[in-house]
Amino acid sequence: MRIQEMDMREMGMSGKEQERTGKPSEAFYRVEKQLTIQLIPQKGNERLLAEVPHIRWLDLAMVFRIYREEEGCSLSLLIGREQLSDWNVTVEEVARKAMEHMPRLLPVKLCGVTEELERTAKGMGLTPPKSPEPEDGLKLYLLTNQRGYNGAAAILYEGVLEKFAEEVGKDLILLPSSVHEVLLLPDGGDSDYEALSALVQAVNETQVRREEWLSDHVYRYLKEEDRIIAAGNGTEGNGVKGGVWG
């Protein structure tokens, strides 16, 4: 499905349909179930972040979009400061509504990378590649949403990382593939986070379009603490509660 991205700051769209009160406007209630979060890197997006409502989260930032599907085409509208003013809401209120409705609007997709490659190959009429199981028994998993669009934000979905970590019985390493997806690797306890971060950097530079970069290092999910921390490149230590913006 084709997805058309638009910027509400450039469209002159506003919700000024009633006088301001202490409550959100009717326009906000009409769009609240279409609110979504896009995770982007803070670095390199300073100009954008100076102009749009956002919440900083580790070294990333949450920006907000309205996602609609109409007549075989998906529309993704970036929300500007004017919309929050017109809607009479705070950025935290937008974030809470997005967290509430996004898992239903864009359901999570979590599967093995090998299985996903096999499905893709079969769908294209190709012979699925044969991938040997890793010697350490640790599989690589793909986390995104059912549309594969801005799916890295699925790491924010309540309980997703917690439940998966419980299933595999290990902490998780999060490899930021792009703004659209994150790769998950069960942490065997002897992982080289610096080497994995170097791998992420190499993939970014050779395989990912610049505007779709998410991060140049890996993250860790600590299941006993339900917490995500940055790892690699000297970033070890700062963290936020899993599924909660900070």
For the regions a language model picked out, list residue spans one by one.
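N-terminal accessory interaction module
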Residues: 1, 34, 39-51
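Intrinsically disordered, low-complexity regions
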Residues: 3, 8, 172, 193, ...
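Feature targets compositionally biased, intrinsically disordered low-complexity regions
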Residues: 11-14, 122, 136, 150, ...
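A contiguous, surface-oriented mixed alpha/beta subdomain in the mid-to-C-terminal portion of proteins
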Residues: 46-207
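Alpha-helical oligomerization segments
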Residues: 178-246
